[in-house]
Amino acid sequence: MSSPHRASTTQQLADLSLTEGEHDEGKPLSIDYLQGHEGLIEEVLKWSEHEQLDFMDKIVHRLSHYQLGKVDNFIRPMLQRDFISNLPAHLVELILFNVNSDSLKSCEEVSTSWRCALARGQHWKKLIEKNVRSDSLWWGLSEKRQWDKFLNISRDMSVRRICEKFNYDVNIKRDKLDQLILMHVFYSKLYPKIIRDIHNIDNNWKRGNYKMTRINCQSENSKGVYCLQYDDDKIVSGLRDNTIKIWDRKDYSCSRILSGHTGSVLCLQYDNRVIISGSSDATVRVWDVETGECIKTLIHHCEAVLHLRFANGIMVTCSKDRSIAVWDMVSPRDITIRRVLVGHRAAVNVVDFDDRYIVSASGDRTIKVWSMDTLEFVRTLAGHRRGIACLQYRGRLVVSGSSDNTIRLWDIHSGVCLRVLEGHEELVRCIRFDEKRIVSGAYDGKIKVWDLQAALDPRALSSEICLCSLVQHTGRVFRLQFDDFQIVSSSHDDTILIWDFLDAPPSGLPSSTNRATLPELPNQAAVARAQMLFEMAARREIERRDREVVEEPALRPRANAARRHNADIAAAAAAAEAARGAGDNDESSSEEDLDRVDQVNNPNVAGPAPPQPHNQNHRRRQPRPELPVRLMQEMAAFDNMRRQQNNMDHLGGGDVDEEMPDGGP
């Protein structure tokens, strides 16, 4: 049985021969041809497609120039056939639904019939809706720009809203095609505006261009905002003053304060029903989101609860007591412990989990992976040189931050470290990532944005990975979260900052709260400069004292002793300056062994003696009482700092060397 394609080819050959015969001869075709060509066609149809093409090639090469022109006139319309006009509507719909924006623009310019076909199918609207369903950035942008109300709705409602938007008379009756064209024009103009918004957002992230909103959380007893979570309506924060404060996103006022913890609120998470918080008072509390009532208090850990996560009826908590607790959540009031995981040799600072693994990080410098099904240990991820303060786990990727000032990316299945990111000058306290970016916050007061895809590419240079550094906090960054449009961060400086990359001013135009309006935190260069200035002042003071005692040989040893302390004084000045910038009595996280900090800060605990002067036979002399009081105070401060550092080194040093009065992170 001959195929339709072959029959069509034969018919074309016959028609072509008939046309040319009539033109060339000016008379009907011969009887011999009419009787013989049918048999020839039947014979050609028996050949394969390749044989037919070869046969046609041989014929074409034997045709005259005039005949080739006639063949071209016959074939060209067949190759340029208007399939939009000839195909059934449902096939046209299917074809146009799968083209991209550039192809849609080209289709609009083909002909009026094509433009009408695009209008009937509302293909610009469908392209926007498809992107909104598949891309979180499009979805979020549709809500923030409020064009989501023009999507996924009936045609009549679309026309009404579009007319209202452009101040058209809604009551004017329009025929169906006019309505479709009106909607088509609206969506075809909306699409490039969306693309422009997306391009601007991406550039703002890369350039560190943002609009800043600052929430002042300072109160009589507050000394830092340790944790937070946010949505479009509120920000929930946990503070060192033992409270949870909820902030309204409309006017950024404090709408509610939850009190009950007797220690710093170190971690929290909420959903549409409950807020669950962990504290340095070693308890976990469950709060009703609507009423703010504490409906459950969980007592299990014997020391501070440093982090918690819950999802799908499971909660995991970790503590300074070096353990991890897995809980079953039947309801907000029915939460029972399933199992305790033990294996870390220091405080467990952070946990994360999904339906496959629980991942925990500790001050013992390791990340441990546990099976969610069996709750058994699986493997250890080792590589950080000091304690680990933060991590996030998603898919196959684990990203961790440490007090060795680095960020590491790990493959959870193989345990391989994929990349080490360097750039922070102090402990990396908080870290989050999505499909595009890693955002980290550290004790140097900086927030850094990293390109995740570049970080995963072994060919990428280190200079290409860090997109920007954001400096607005005047204290240590404790916690942050982010989405496609913003970062929300909290700090020891008692503020919550909202970094808006959607409504940022154009690049180069300063904002009222742009980074240039606030001084940066003291960095190494500033500390070195302060040290140099104070050293010069101390040297001048000692030289003046030397001149005074030239005539008094008995006083010269005291001047020499002061000169020997010159370097110590300069270092003490730098340390004092840094301490004043960072704040006093701060809390920190990620201690390798939090107990040892108490030992260091406890004067009753014996430690190694401070280093002796180079000349062991020389007996240290007290400085002259006439020396400036400031010099004496800073010398004493330096001696105390050196003594504490020696004690820390003696105890094994590998972690965060900051004081933790509350035991919180």
UniProtKB/Swiss-Prot annotation:
The gene is lin-23. The keyword S-adenosyl-L-methionine does not apply. CDD domains: WD40. InterPro entries: Beta-TrCP_D (IPR021977), F-box-like_dom_sf (IPR036047), F-box_dom (IPR001810), G-protein_beta_WD-40_rep (IPR020472), WD-F-box_domain-protein (IPR050995), WD40/YVTN_repeat-like_dom_sf (IPR015943), WD40_repeat_CS (IPR019775), WD40_repeat_dom_sf (IPR036322). One of its GO terms (molecular function) is protein dimerization activity. WD repeats lie at residues 220-257, 260-299, 301-337, 343-380, 383-420, 423-460, 472-509. Residues 81-127 form the F-box domain. This is F-box/WD repeat-containing protein lin-23. Functions cell autonomously to negatively regulate cell cycle progression. Required to restrain cell proliferation in response to developmental cues. Probably recognizes and binds to some proteins and promotes their ubiquitination and degradation. One of its GO terms (biological process) is neuron projection morphogenesis. It holds the Pfam family Beta-TrCP_D. The lineage of its organism: Eukaryota, Metazoa, Ecdysozoa, Nematoda, Chromadorea. Coiled coil: none annotated. PROSITE patterns: FBOX (PS50181), WD_REPEATS_1 (PS00678), WD_REPEATS_2 (PS50082), WD_REPEATS_REGION (PS50294). Residues 574-665 are annotated as: Disordered. Part of a SCF (SKP1-cullin-F-box) protein ligase complex. Residues 584-595, 655-665 have a biased composition (Acidic residues). Keywords: Cell cycle, Cell division, Cytoplasm, Developmental protein, Repeat, Ubl conjugation pathway, WD repeat. One of its GO terms (cellular component) is nucleus. It is found in: Cytoplasm.
